[in-house]
């Protein structure tokens, strides 16, 4: 039996491959800090992209983008700040928050899905 973690990892890898096909360079998967986790950290040109991956088997469970609520955005923002601080990225590094939604077999990317949340 496959657990949720294994399913999530599989879709994160699939999302990473999708991002790379669209010019991103994946730096890291599943970066964790005490504040939480970011699914994918990647470079897209000059941008450091913090990417949340959401999967739904079908639309009955709702739109995957809806799962990235304000609370989740705050968590991702805090972890992104910690990542930049601990990996030598300064205040001048352009960053953004993207979301990859997987609905069944369809993958959709929203760049700059949300702004930094305090």
Summary of predicted features, one role per range:
Residues 26-28, 50, 97:
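Hydrophobic residues on conserved beta-strands that form the core of alpha/beta folds
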Residues 1-29:
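Acidic-basic catalytic patches of nuclease active cores, encompassing PD-(D/E)XK
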Residues 19, 76, 97:
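Residue-level signal for inorganic ion chemistry
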Residues 60-92:
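Mid-chain, well-packed structural core segment of small domains
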Residues 85-118:
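Domain-level recognition of nuclease-like catalytic cores that cleave nucleotide substrates
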Residues 33-36:
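Short acidic/glycine-enriched loop/turn segments that link adjacent beta-strands
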Residues 38-62, 76:
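Conserved catalytic cores of phosphodiester-cleaving nucleases, focusing on short active-site segments
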